[in-house]
Amino acid sequence: MYGWVNLDKPCGMSSALAVNLVKRILNVKKAGHAGTLDPLASGVLPIAIGEATKVMPYAVDVIKSYLFTVQWGEQRTTDDAEGEIVDKSDMIPCVENIKKIIPDFIGLLKQVPPSFSAVHVNGVRAFELARSGQDVNLSSRFVDVLELKLLSFDVENNKADFYLSCRKGVYVRSIARDLGIKLGCLGYVTKLQRVRVGCFRKKNAITLEMLKTLYSTNCKSSYLLPLWYVLQDIKHLNNFFSELEIKKLKNGQNIELNNLYVIRNCDICYVSTGNVPVAICSIVNSVVRPVRIFNVRGLVF
């Protein structure tokens, strides 16, 4: 079995546990997720099954979108509801001031990850140091925020809902923290839902319970997306090469194209035969070089 599960991860579960549960449900040995989702967050968690794990890099460096709620008035150690209160503010922001500073959080900007994060510090994850009581001083790094919108503001409960679209590496908790600091009212995330990871969308995601039910029907197309689902933005060559050439690619050998082939150069392409995955290849000066070879015998469905 190989392909992708577009999982709707529940709140309160780690991404690693979600992967293990999917492996258990589908009875597979090899699986991995494309981008960690915090335990307190819910939503889209793409999980690669079997040979699809070889194309996971193409599902990581993609646009991601979130819906999140910020509670104003407090700063917490984890920048979310799990942490301890470290500071308070009586100030209540207004819609006008929130909208006024939003442009400062769009584009290429420097961001300091939360102390409780998976960022490595001298080979140790930051959250492990923070949990042991050590001071964690993380360096800022450049991140790319494409869009940030204020969706609603609950004055009575002093909280606001936002929509965020960004590239990899952005911490929503850091966005909430920095919004609160800039407004002078402090803030932390109380609710976080990921609604998009590249081509994976929340509206098409399935829960673990749904996966169990669909798996029992023995209809793979109802819960498993094809391996090439994350390769839609790269060139696809299906039934392009001869049987002998396909055999060479599968054995890791290069192919030299003759004058009959139109393609001369291609940074990266996906090669298949009869829509069965063969390899990820590069083509330079009419030489096809297999970069990733898929060990599959037939279609997933």
Swiss-Prot record:
GO terms for biological process: mRNA pseudouridine synthesis; tRNA pseudouridine synthesis. This is tRNA pseudouridine synthase B. It catalyses: uridine(55) in tRNA = pseudouridine(55) in tRNA. HAMAP family: TruB_bact (MF_01080). One of its GO terms (molecular function) is tRNA pseudouridine(55) synthase activity. Its EC number is 5.4.99.25. The keyword tRNA processing applies. CDD domains: PseudoU_synth_EcTruB (cd02573). The keyword Isomerase applies. Pfam families: TruB_C_2, TruB_N. Belongs to the pseudouridine synthase TruB family. Type 1 subfamily. Keywords: Isomerase, tRNA processing. The gene is truB. It comes from the Bacteria. Gene3D superfamilies: Pseudouridine synthase. The active site is at D38 (nucleophile). Responsible for synthesis of pseudouridine from uracil-55 in the psi GC loop of transfer RNAs.
